[in-house]
Amino acid sequence: MKMISTPKYLGPDIKTILAEKGLDSDGRLWRGRLENTSGREVERALACATGSYSLEKLLAFISPAAEDYLEEMAQLARQLTVQRFGRTIRLYAPLYLSNFCVNSCRYCGFHRENKFKRTRLTIEQALTEADIIAAEGFRDILLVSSEDRKIVSIEYLTELAKKLRDKFSSISIEVYQMGVAEYAKLFEAGIKGVTVYQETYDRQAYAYYHREGPKSDYDNRLDTPDRVAAAGMREIGLGALLGLADWRAETLALAEHAHYLVKRYWRSRVSFSFPRLRPAYSRLQTSDHLSLGSCHLL
């Protein structure tokens, strides 16, 4: 199978970028700057914002001072959205394949210690569900499962993708982490995008919430989008689970991650999701500061 080569990238990797900027910790290095950002700085960011990214502009836009400029930011966001994407909205539908999981994440109702009936759709069942989704007019589909590669194998995903690719214009997956060769095999089968949430960029918080299982490896998780792009995938979905750590620090880290990927893998497009905490049954104890209301967004 053919791997996708990219122009030589001479910059640092994402682990180095986050570490040097203090964005793989609890964000305390940035807290003072955020709190001391003035309204005048927000106005300057609005005046010079042409759609190009800079960490300084983003810092101004998510600072407490920016709460007084919500309408101006909304107008600018709309202007840039229409300029880049036109007056269209791209919709996709998720198809849940399995809730078997080998990880033990404190915040997740699917973690392996929870005792409930687990299910994995057969290929035939998945195709039936996909037909219903297609009949509703959706042409983009996201195949989702908890993380257990023995239950939802590469072969399973490959077979399913080959049977779905004539029904949908775009097939993406949100499953477990893989290697470059595995992603390349799925790409050849018709899967063009991968969503992988870092959940939190704070190393200490990550270690606390992801107790055991393959997902407990912070660096492997962080490097996954690189492997996705190296395999030729056209769409890379990123996200942080808002509520696990300081949302402003997470936003800065997420933006730096995306900026790095765009520079290094220019053939792939990067998108964001903003998942948030919702109630879920858990046999595991979580920290006292974990709160459904802790993600105050502008």
Report each predicted region and the residues it spans:
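Canonical Radical SAM [4Fe-4S] cluster-binding loop centered on the CxxxCxxC motif
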Residues: 83-125
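Conserved C-terminal portion of the radical SAM core fold
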Residues: 145, 168, 219-283, 292-298
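Active-site beta-loop-alpha junctions enriched in small/polar residues
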Residues: 94-96, 146-148, 174-178, 199-201, ...
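Short Fe-S-cluster ligation motifs
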Residues: 128-148
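Glycine-rich anion/phosphate-binding loops
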Residues: 115-128, 217-220, 253
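Flexible, acidic/Gly-rich N-terminal and inter-domain linker regions that tether
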Residues: 1-95, 103
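Glycine-rich, proline-tolerant flexible connector loops at the mouths of alpha/beta enzymes
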Residues: 62, 93-95, 112-114, 142-154, ...
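Radical SAM/AdoMet-radical enzyme domain recognition
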Residues: 105, 139-141, 154-241
